[in-house]
């Protein structure tokens, strides 16, 4: 079993070194490969011990992955809609927090904190900029590696709700920017919609929640859901941390009277 697992690790290292797969893809498949390699080693060892040494047995077993490959490719892609939500407490009023959501300029890497998905190569957000007014306004998010996409506003009620649907124009995701297994609106995952909800807490601060819905189109639904949710939760954590930092800085810069008298307006009349 140890030999099989070691062989799998060497195979994955070779895939990365020869640039056949990116680091993101390697990290995604490591658990599956290690489990499959270990099980394969156990089965192969059991067959070897039961039947003794046979020169034709090992080559026959080695051909099994190639025989099952076409069967897997022939299986239809399944689809499931999944939802991920993260919440953070912010020491600023909902009005102040809401005003930080539309335009998020010049994001510095240190503002995002540590993120596992960014560590393995997922591009970091650079800025988000709102264009237009009211419902139908477009918030354009730009990431590293020239990745960008749009969020079309579907509901805006300051300081309670900001919702949007995702739009990924053709050419917005450079082919080399993301591994195909985590590509936005690629063969495996598709972003549907999302948004922020804000609730005033007892201390006058804000409970800010970020929700994203995505479609899992992979054949391995359970595994795809696991990684899809892990990636989004990690990304949500970075964005919510950024909103917390900027909102609390903005709140501390306001005079007390402004915090108490801040009007509640509709985004439609403000943008």
Features from the language model and the residues they span:
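Glycine-rich portal/gate segments that line the openings of hydrophobic small-molecule binding cavities
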Residues: 1-2, 33-37, 59-61, 119-195, ...
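Membrane-embedded alpha-helical segments of integral membrane proteins
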Residues: 2-48
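Hydrophobic ligand-binding cavity/cleft-lining segments
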Residues: 5-14, 22, 47, 53-134, ...
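Soluble non-cytosolic domains of exported or imported proteins
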Residues: 33, 91-92, 189, 226-237
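Short, highly charged C-terminal tails/helix-capping segments
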Residues: 53-69, 244-271
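Short strand-connecting beta-turns/loops that link adjacent beta-strands
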Residues: 93, 145-146, 158-159, 201-205
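Hydrophobic pocket/interface hotspot
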Residues: 96-101, 107, 153, 164, ...
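C-terminal/domain-terminus segments
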Residues: 211-236, 259-264
């Amino acid at each position: 079993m140890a030999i099989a697992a070691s062989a799998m690790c060497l195979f994955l290292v070779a895939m990365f070194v020869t640039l056949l797969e990116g680091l993101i893809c390697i990290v995604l498949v490591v658990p599956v490969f290690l489990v499959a390699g270990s099980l394969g080693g156990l089965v192969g060892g059991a067959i070897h011990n039961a039947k003794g040494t046979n020169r034709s047995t090992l080559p026959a077993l080695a051909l099994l992955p190639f025989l099952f490959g076409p069967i897997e490719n022939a299986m239809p892609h399944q689809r499931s809609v999944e939802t991920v939500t993260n919440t953070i407490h912010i020491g600023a009023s909902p009005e102040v927090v809401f005003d930080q959501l539309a335009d998020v300029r010049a994001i510095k890497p240190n503002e995002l904190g540590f993120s596992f998905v960014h560590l393995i190569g997922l591009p970091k957000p650079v800025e988000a900029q709102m264009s237009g007014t009211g419902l139908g306004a477009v918030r354009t998010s730009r990431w590293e590696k020239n990745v960008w996409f749009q969020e079309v506003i579907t509901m805006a009620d300051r300081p309670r709700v900001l919702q949007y649907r995702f739009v990924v124009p053709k050419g917005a995701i450079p082919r080399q920017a993301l591994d195909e297994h985590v590509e936005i609106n690629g063969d495996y995952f598709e972003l549907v919609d999302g948004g922020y909800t804000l609730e005033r807490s007892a201390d006058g601060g804000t409970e800010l929640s970020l929700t994203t819905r995505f479609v899992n189109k992979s054949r391995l639904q359970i595994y795809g859901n696991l990684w899809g949710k892990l990636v989004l939760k990690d990304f949500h954590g970075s964005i919510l941390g950024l909103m917390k930092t900027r909102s609390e800085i903005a709140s501390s810069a306001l005079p007390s009277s402004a915090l108490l008298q801040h009007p509640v307006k509709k985004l439609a009349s403000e943008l």
